[in-house]
Amino acid sequence: MVKLWRRYKPFINAGIQELITYRVNFILYRIGDVMGAFVAFYLWKAVFDSSQESLIQGFSMADITLYIIMSFVTNLLTRSDSSFMIGEEVKDGSIIMRLLRPVHFAASYLFTELGSKWLIFISVGLPFLSVIVLIKILSGQGILEVLGLTVLYLFSLTLAYLINFFFNICFGFSAFVFKNLWGSNLLKTSIVAFMSGSLIPLAFFPKIVSEILSFLPFSSLIYTPVMIIVGKYDASQILKALLLQFFWLIVMVGLSQLIWKRVQSFITIQGG
């Protein structure tokens, strides 16, 4: 364990330093995310104001507001830029430096991201989550229930990030074949945002569509952890959702290993 820590600590430090160095860029992107959350809030407010019902698909306006907030936080903590990093490093040729290091290829990206994720969690995720927990307790929910859901949310959040990371690693490996992933990365991000429930809760889709999307790995990224913290899942649904997350994590890890063995023969160094 000590040897592993010493080997990957520089990557963790690099992730932290990168976030600190480009903090203005990070803040500007987050402002854009917050503006998007406000747009979503007012769209849903208009929907509820025009509806005769106080509940739509089991959601009240308060539930939707909490969903929007936690979707923003969860997206921030589970997103992975590994496919973008691989694509850029393949394009400019710097991928050779990573390949020459005596470390696991995917793990080097993982620990770099973990460095930045830890900083984001402390500075953004924890304050938001603390406020949500406090509001839930003050609204009359039992302390043990709220704390239990929070722990389950954090566990689900961890699984969600790992699924997303290895999915992006798999996608990023295609850069060794196609050489440029800029356009396809943007398309991938948009599709995943839609299918993960980040924009619209999957419960609002037609039943058959909702069931299909709920089984796919993308629902595990945003929808599952957010539904847990919002309190829309009972104990059996939480267990089922967590088992599905475990399943997709195993699939993504296995798939990443398989694809990596296949694409190594396509490695060519560009740039100079």
Go through each PLM region and give its residues.
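Hydrophobic transmembrane alpha-helices and immediately adjacent juxtamembrane helices
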Residues: 1-272
